[in-house]
Amino acid sequence: MDKIYDVIIIGSGPAGLSAAIYCARGNLSCMVIEKEVYGGKLSKTYEIDNYPGVGKISGAELAQKYVDQVKSFNIEIITADINRIENLDTCKKLSATNGNSFLARNIIVATGASENRLNLERADEFTGRGISYCAVCDGFFYRK
C-alpha cells in the first residue's frame, strides 16, 4: 500500500480501459481494479460486428484486445472488490474486501451498468443466444 498512484480506475470495461490508456499517455501512474472479469460486460457479449475496423468478433476476444493494449502501457490490472473509499490528507485510500488497500490521488469510477435480468429458468443459458437485453445492440441479429 506504500505506492500512491496518480489515478486508480475502478472497472475494466471499455470506459475504464480507455481511461487507463489516456492516463498512461499523459504520464500518470495508474492502476485498474476489476471486481469480476477483465473487459467488464463486454467480455460477456456473445458477438460484436459493429465495431469499426474489427469485423465480427466475440466480446471476450475484443475485451482481451483492450486488456492487451492496456498492458502494453505497463498498466497494472488487478482483481479486487473495492468496498470503501476514504479521504486522507493527501490522497484517497481504497479498501478491498480481501483486506488489501490502495492509495490514489484521483479515482475514476467506471463500473458500468447492469440490466434487469429475466427471472426465468435457464435464462442465463440463452442470453446472447435468443434472449437479449439491448434492442439497439442486438436487433440486427433478429432480422429476416
Regions of interest found by a model, annotated:
Residues M1-I10, I77-K144:
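FAD-binding core/adjacent interface of flavoenzyme oxidoreductases
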Residues G13-A15, V37, A113-E115:
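Residue-level detector of alpha-helix initiation sites
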Residues V37-Y38, K56, V136-C137:
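Short, acidic/turn-prone active-site loops that include or flank metal/cofactor-
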Residues S43-S101:
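N-terminal Rossmann-like dinucleotide/flavin-binding domain of flavoprotein oxidoreductases
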Residues A20-I21, K44, N119-R122:
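Short amphipathic alpha-helical segments
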